[in-house]
Regions:
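Loop-to-transmembrane-helix transition segments
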Residues: 17-42, 109-117, 156, 165-184, ...
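Helix-helix packing/entry segments at the starts of transmembrane helices
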Residues: 55-61, 127-149, 182-218
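Cytoplasmic-side transmembrane-helix entry/capping segments in multi-pass membrane proteins
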Residues: 24-33, 78-90, 110-111, 135-145
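Membrane-interface helix termini and inter-helical loops of multi-pass transporters
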Residues: 48, 97-107, 156-174, 217-226
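Specific alpha-helical transmembrane segments that line the substrate/conduction pathway
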Residues: 2-7, 35, 44-77, 117, ...
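Transmembrane alpha-helical segments that form core, pore/gating elements
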Residues: 6-9, 66-68, 102-160, 174
Length: 252
């Protein structure tokens, strides 16, 4: 996924920024890329030891981690209403996943991996916010994705994972993940974090199940369950409340 993303971005980067290769001398994007790589590593590994419902609950804690990082280290002026919005959105994620949720102790190791993935996702957005104020969008994107791909490649090599022989279908999925969730999804987050607190950006990620449900309803004619509807409603209310309180904070 990250390799193909870098592959797509490379021609543009080396054409437009071929005289600005000093970007590679900056150590800070290496750190952000490392955080992103750790997020993906722990997140994907978590599914080997726990189920989707448990993993979603713990990854949904990402906005809370981000809030704590901004509160403790960035002195971001976030009103209490933002925290209330986060808790509402977390409750919505819990409602959506309730049908696939098992006893946490049964899947403890996988749950801890998902929780760790949430923490590093928060670190990725938190550190990226300050860096985006100093580095142009496209070079930042390219550098972070490149370093993340290199670190993930190193992790795979250490684990003895082969880079070849996965079949046409799997490589097509990798391409799809690169074009959609990475180049559109993650890149949008990296653009937004330049203008919004990382907490608000990470909170918006919790809206993903809502979009997925709508697409499944439109394209696959899947029914929207009551728990999905109620959980989605809570998530939207939470995102709205956090955003409104953030705007009030920004007002003179």
């Amino acid at each position: 996924r990250m390799f193909f993303s870098v592959l797509f971005l490379s021609p543009v980067f080396f054409y437009k920024y071929r005289n600005d290769l000093d970007y590679f001398l900056d150590i800070r994007p290496v750190i952000v890329g490392f955080f992103l790589a750790l997020h993906f590593f722990f997140w994907i590994t978590a599914f080997e030891y726990t189920n989707v419902g448990n993993a979603v609950i713990f990854i949904a804690l990402q906005p809370l981690f981000t809030y704590l990082l901004e509160y403790l280290f960035a002195k971001e002026d976030l009103r209490k209403g933002v925290l209330t919005g986060i808790m509402l959105a977390l409750a919505g994620s819990l409602v959506i996943s309730i049908g696939d949720l098992t006893m946490l102790m049964e899947k403890l190791w996988g749950d801890l991996l998902a929780l760790t993935a949430a923490f590093f996702a928060a670190c990725y957005l938190f550190r990226g916010r300050s860096l985006r104020e100093e580095i142009e969008y496209f070079p930042y994107l390219y550098l972070v994705y490149t370093y993340a791909a290199l670190f993930l490649g190193l992790f795979a090599f250490i684990q003895g994972v082969s880079f070849t022989g996965h079949g046409v279908y799997n490589y097509s999925c990798f391409l799809g993940l690169a074009l959609g969730p990475t180049l559109i999804g993650h890149s949008s987050l990296n653009y937004s974090v330049r203008f919004l607190p990382a907490t608000i950006v990470s909170l918006a990620i919790l809206g993903e199940p809502i979009l997925t449900t709508i697409l499944a309803w439109v394209l696959l004619h899947e029914k929207i369950t009551l728990t999905t509807f109620l959980g989605g409603l809570l998530i939207l209310i939470g995102i709205y409340k956090a955003s409104v309180n953030r705007q009030k904070t920004s007002s003179p």
